[in-house]
Amino acid sequence: MNINEMLKKAKRLQAEMEVEEKEIAKKEFVVKKQGIKVVMLGTRKIKTIEISPALIDPEDPELVQDLVMLAINEAIDIIDEEYDELGDKYSNTSI
């Protein structure tokens, strides 16, 4: 394979990866944890947070705070895994 063919293939792979990155960015990731529901976009922006009224205890606000934090962190981890898989897919492709 000559250098021009390698450059063309690299550009094609880069374009494909950019398309897939945009698809992940638009995707919604949903995590449900014990009465908490977090919907996060692939851009890592929170779309919605739903909290079950049964969880709201004025005597223990830390419970809800902890559950929200856990759900958000899990959503971020799931998104990061998708991006890592995408990166692995293209880094293992020979040019």
UniProtKB/Swiss-Prot annotation:
Protein name: Nucleoid-associated protein MARTH_orf159
Function description: Binds to DNA and alters its conformation. May be involved in regulation of gene expression, nucleoid organization and DNA protection.
GO molecular function, one term: DNA binding
Subunit structure: Homodimer.
GO cellular component, one term: cytoplasm
Family annotation (InterPro entries): YbaB-like_sf, YbaB/EbfC
Family: Belongs to the YbaB/EbfC family.
